[in-house]
Every structure is written in C-alpha cells, then in structure tokens.
Amino acid sequence: MASPSHPSRDCSQVIDHSHVPEFEVATWIKITLILVYLVIFVVGILGNSVTIRVTQVLQKKGYLQKEVTDHMVSLACSDILVFLIGMPMEFYSIIWNPLTTPSYTVSCKVHTFLFEACSYATLLHVLTLSFERYIAICHPFRYKAMSGPCQVKLLIGFVWVTSALVALPLLFAMGVEYPLVNVPSHRGLICNRSRTRHQEQPESSNMSICTNLSSRWTVFQSSIFSAFVVYLVVLVSVAFMCWSMMQVLRRSKQGTLAAQGQQLQLRKLESQESRSARRQTIIFLELIVVTLAVCWMPNQVRRIMAAAKPKHDWTKSYFRAYMILLPFSDTFFYLSSVVNPLLYNVSSQQFRSVFGQVLRCQLTLPHANQEKHLRAHVASTMDSTRSACRPLIFPASQRSSSSARANMVFLSTFHSEAKPESKPQELSCESPEPNSERKPANPATRNGFQEHEV
C-alpha cells in the first residue's frame, strides 16, 4: 500500500503504455524531414568542405593568419562530423524507426557519445576562435606571446578533449530501454497504474527506444544540465568578447578622427585595411552568437525537458509539446552547422569571392604582397627618377610639396604602426644644420634630409 503522505491517485493526464507508439512521428512529418535533412546534409557537407579549401587558399596567399586558419578548419571538420555521425543515425533511430528492441544498445551509446562530442566541439571552437580574435584586438602585446603553432594546437586539443569529457557521461547514461520504466528512488507522481499496460513485456513487443536508462537517471540529469551550463557560458563569453572588441575599435576610430596633422592622417590610411578586417571578424562573431542562440536554444530546451522529469511522470500535454518540438529542434540544430560557411560569405567579400572561385575550380586570387610590392617598386622608381633630374638644394616650398607626395606613396605601403624601435631612427634623420627649421612629424623634413645626404 502507498504511504499516507503519498496517497495513490488515478493520474488520468499522465501518459501510459498506450502513448508509447506516439514516440514515432506521423508519416507526413517523416517525409518532410527526409527532404529537409537531405538538403541540409548536402549543403552542409559541401559548404564546410569548400570552407576548408578556401581558408587554406587564403592562408597560402597571405590573406589569413595560420592561427585563424587552423581554428576555422577544425570548426569546419567538427561540423562535417556532426552531419556524418549525427544526421543519418538520428533520422533512422529517432525519426523514422524509433521503436526497436534492446539489441541496439551499443550503437545507441556510441552514436549518442560521438554526436554529443562533435556538437560541443563546434560550440567550443566558436569560443576559442572568439578568444583568439579578442586577444589579438584587445591585447595585441599579449597576442604575440600567446599565439603560435604550439598554442593553437593546444587550444584545438583542449576543445576536443573537453568535448569528449562533456559527452562521456552519456556513454553510460544512454541505452535502449522501454521509455516508461520507473526510475528507482525517484519521488515523482504516484499513480494507480493497475489498469494500464505498464507491466507488459516491451522487449517482446518492440516498444523500446534509444533513451536515457532508468538506472542511470542521476548521471543523465547531471550530464544534460552540465552541458547546458557550458552552452550558456560560451554564449555569454563570446558576447562579452565581441562587445569588448567593438569598444576597442570604436575608441581607435574616434582617436584617429580627432587628431590633426599629416602624419596622423597617414596613420589612418595605413591602418584602414587592418581595421576593416577586424570589423569583418566582429560581424562574423556577432552573427555566430545570434546563430548559437537561435539554432541551439530549441534543442537545449528539448534536452532540458527530457532531463527535468522521467518519462513515466510526463503528462499528455508535456509529452505532445516534446514531440512537437523534436523535429524543429533537430532541424535548427543542424542549421547551425550549415550557417557557418554562409556567415563567412556574408561577413567577408574576399572570402565570398574565393568561395566562388573554388566552386568554379578557377583560382585567380593574387598574393597579398604582390600589389604592395608593385606599388613600392613604382614609388621607388619615380623617386629615383626625380632625385636624378633635380638639384640637391631646393627652395623650402618646392621641397615641402614634392616630398610630401613622395612620402604619401611610400608610407601607404605599410599596414602596421611604427614600432617603438623605429623612433631613434626618426630622430637621427634631422638636418644637422643648426639654423634650419624642422619638425619631427613633417615628412618634408625627412625627405629633405635624404636629399641632403645624396
């Protein structure tokens, strides 16, 4: 008999054995999902494969740092594994034919573990890529000490090891079991199920599904809730790093515009490419945050629903809400891996151009230094021609106008600000004449000194 504190009740709203076949969705949903999954699978595999090739081309041509390339390649590989490991098995065992016998326990465990590991590898890759850009933009001096092939390998290794640890509990908590088996020592609803068919032999009637094992309920709950915390931490961290990077770029822009003088105007011109690349990175990371929030949240809600209470305590409305959410959450989750190549194309015109070239198998991208070397060579040739055709001593007005134009072309070939070691060289370039007027920031004076030396 039930204890007086927990009287036996007839829970008419709680699901029973008659609802177990409803774990299999309707036929029209199956057909719709197979078409949607097929499109997502092809686009996802193709997009991420081309992304790997594009990043390698950009890195070889000098447009992308090797550290960023390694992160993007590893992220694309994790997305591809999500499709290869997760989509076929999940569609067959959860959507198309969820009701089976306990003989598929090993495949259920292995699939769940690998799928969870690859999914969170994608999530953590977004975190490490954001962290790498955050250090490069907000802490550039630390970036040189923290960047490098060894550090990148350690970060990527950290991602995969952590993902495996996050997924490891599911290797023990998942299996093939009748979904309405009572969880031992669980204080849930106490209902009179004497008139239901819970005591039938589900093994003989093919009523088992790949689900959490009742004997490992605590392990399953801990795994799902811990993974959800990891998801929230990644979202908050990436959002914070994007906000910090935007603040740094905004302060840098305001400082350049507020300054006066020829030298600071040249600094604005020479750093325009680097600031444009940084803006593209931030746009990409912002879109990644939105994607993670929109595409991952339905799947996280469904997982929380599964871990909040055992299935034998689910009400009919709770069960129907779960089954309605199931196809939508899975579809949006796979879209998060499809959308990464799309975000690369949206946030970077250069990436979009090379992406199209790779699809057409016609690579026409020149090396990044080719145009710079050409401009420098033309500027050097013109400067040598002028120096050979004019006298050594010029009036101050002519020297100022001509040398300012020459230095404008010369300094435009640089893409980073002068290092502190270059300051003594600027001081040594002053004219030795005591009566001459000179300003350290005036490019005409420096060019005049070069003519004086000639």
Swiss-Prot record:
<comment type="subunit">
    <text>Interacts with HTR1A. Interacts with GALR1.</text>
</comment>
<feature type="transmembrane region" description="Helical; Name=5">
    <location>
        <begin position="218"/>
        <end position="242"/>
    </location>
</feature>
<dbReference type="GO" id="GO:0005886">
    <property type="term" value="C:plasma membrane"/>
</dbReference>
<keyword id="KW-0675">Receptor</keyword>
<feature type="glycosylation site" description="N-linked (GlcNAc...) asparagine">
    <location>
        <position position="192"/>
    </location>
</feature>
<keyword id="KW-1015">Disulfide bond</keyword>
<dbReference type="InterPro" id="IPR052676">
    <property type="entry name" value="Zinc-sensing_GPCR"/>
</dbReference>
<keyword id="KW-1133">Transmembrane helix</keyword>
<feature type="topological domain" description="Cytoplasmic">
    <location>
        <begin position="132"/>
        <end position="151"/>
    </location>
</feature>
<keyword id="KW-0479">Metal-binding</keyword>
<keyword id="KW-0597">Phosphoprotein</keyword>
<keyword id="KW-0812">Transmembrane</keyword>
<feature type="topological domain" description="Cytoplasmic">
    <location>
        <begin position="345"/>
        <end position="454"/>
    </location>
</feature>
<dbReference type="InterPro" id="IPR000276">
    <property type="entry name" value="GPCR_Rhodpsn"/>
</dbReference>
<dbReference type="InterPro" id="IPR017452">
    <property type="entry name" value="GPCR_Rhodpsn_7TM"/>
</dbReference>
<feature type="topological domain" description="Extracellular">
    <location>
        <begin position="1"/>
        <end position="34"/>
    </location>
</feature>
<dbReference type="GO" id="GO:0007186">
    <property type="term" value="P:G protein-coupled receptor signaling pathway"/>
</dbReference>
<feature type="transmembrane region" description="Helical; Name=4">
    <location>
        <begin position="152"/>
        <end position="172"/>
    </location>
</feature>
<feature type="disulfide bond">
    <location>
        <begin position="108"/>
        <end position="210"/>
    </location>
</feature>
<feature type="topological domain" description="Cytoplasmic">
    <location>
        <begin position="243"/>
        <end position="283"/>
    </location>
</feature>
<keyword id="KW-0862">Zinc</keyword>
<dbReference type="GO" id="GO:0046872">
    <property type="term" value="F:metal ion binding"/>
</dbReference>
<feature type="topological domain" description="Extracellular">
    <location>
        <begin position="306"/>
        <end position="323"/>
    </location>
</feature>
<keyword id="KW-0297">G-protein coupled receptor</keyword>
<feature type="transmembrane region" description="Helical; Name=3">
    <location>
        <begin position="110"/>
        <end position="131"/>
    </location>
</feature>
<feature type="transmembrane region" description="Helical; Name=7">
    <location>
        <begin position="324"/>
        <end position="344"/>
    </location>
</feature>
<keyword id="KW-0472">Membrane</keyword>
<feature type="binding site">
    <location>
        <position position="19"/>
    </location>
    <ligand>
        <name>Zn(2+)</name>
    </ligand>
</feature>
<comment type="similarity">
    <text>Belongs to the G-protein coupled receptor 1 family.</text>
</comment>
<feature type="transmembrane region" description="Helical; Name=2">
    <location>
        <begin position="70"/>
        <end position="89"/>
    </location>
</feature>
<keyword id="KW-0325">Glycoprotein</keyword>
<feature type="binding site">
    <location>
        <position position="17"/>
    </location>
    <ligand>
        <name>Zn(2+)</name>
    </ligand>
</feature>
<keyword id="KW-1003">Cell membrane</keyword>
<feature type="topological domain" description="Cytoplasmic">
    <location>
        <begin position="56"/>
        <end position="69"/>
    </location>
</feature>
<feature type="topological domain" description="Extracellular">
    <location>
        <begin position="90"/>
        <end position="109"/>
    </location>
</feature>
<feature type="transmembrane region" description="Helical; Name=1">
    <location>
        <begin position="35"/>
        <end position="55"/>
    </location>
</feature>
<keyword id="KW-0807">Transducer</keyword>
<comment type="function">
    <text>Zinc-sensing receptor that can sense changes in extracellular Zn(2+), mediate Zn(2+) signal transmission, and participates in the regulation of numerous physiological processes including glucose homeostasis regulation, gastrointestinal mobility, hormone secretion and cell death. Activation by Zn(2+) in keratinocytes increases the intracellular concentration of Ca(2+) and activates the ERK/MAPK and PI3K/AKT signaling pathways leading to epithelial repair.</text>
</comment>
<protein>
    <recommendedName>
        <fullName>G-protein coupled receptor 39</fullName>
    </recommendedName>
</protein>
<feature type="topological domain" description="Extracellular">
    <location>
        <begin position="173"/>
        <end position="217"/>
    </location>
</feature>
<feature type="glycosylation site" description="N-linked (GlcNAc...) asparagine">
    <location>
        <position position="212"/>
    </location>
</feature>
<feature type="transmembrane region" description="Helical; Name=6">
    <location>
        <begin position="284"/>
        <end position="305"/>
    </location>
</feature>
